[in-house]
Amino acid sequence: MEVVDFKSILSNGVTITSSGTTGTPKEIFRTPENLKACNAVAIDAQKLTSKSRVLTVTRMTHAGGLLTQSLPAYTLGAELKIQQFNPYTFLKDFQSYTHTFLTPAHMKALVNTKGFKDSNLAGKFVLGGSDPVDWDLIYKFVYQGATVMPNWGMSEIGPITINTTFNDLVQVLHYRHVLKGEFILGDCVYCDIKIVDNELYVRGSICYQEGWLATGDLVESIGKLFSYKGRKNSCNHSN
């Protein structure tokens, strides 16, 4: 298990590195106050408790690995295991746990294993993110019994920020139809948002800076439901 000084992180803050999926990788410092706000959202959104058992297979230097479930689990005193992702052993390992965070690449790798179609993911919570999660992946994991939460966040905010929780196939098909197959951001929002020229702006205590952050992500809203339309050429900050 990777050794992480969670106590020091909570007391002193932490610098995380962006994955580079939205541009040049950069370092973002998260203050103790910001981490407290992010923890509160992550715990509420994913229904994490002291009895949860979290299996982390993503890097601790990234927001997805550290902030989505690992730091919240430590804060709650929940069971936590950190290990490298192995698609051939993951499904067996995950049987002893309740929550995990997977990228779409992880999810695709699991779907392509021999044992996936016979797996029982009932009672398992799978947070998906870092890249947009396509509908086929959401459907296949829910079909196996999992609760799936495709989530939008960034190294600068959240990372649990905008999402939807899926736990039955009718719901998956309905949302997919409403969004006409476009990637989903979600309809549960944990910060202030506005859309300017189709670009998503975010603001709130889970953001590393004050004022509005121009995300560089293009979105479309259907009522309170948001879909992802792609990236602008660059990501700028605005107060």
Where would I find each of the regions flagged by the language model?
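Conserved adenylation A10 loop of the ANL superfamily
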Residues: 12-28
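AMP-binding/adenylate-forming
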Residues: 26-49, 53-111, 149
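Catalytic cores of nucleotide-enabled group-transfer and carboxylate-activating enzymes in metabolic
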Residues: 168, 178-181, 185-191, 196-199, ...
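Charged, glycine/proline-rich intrinsically disordered loops and linkers
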Residues: 1-2, 167-184, 225-232
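Short beta-strand-to-turn element immediately C-terminal to the catalytic PLP-Schiff-base lysine
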Residues: 29-31, 161-165, 196
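Conserved ATP-binding/catalytic segment of the ANL
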Residues: 201-239
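Conserved pre-ATP/AMP-binding loop-to-beta segment of ANL
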Residues: 2-17, 47-53
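Gly/Ser/Thr-rich phosphate-binding loop
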Residues: 99, 111-179
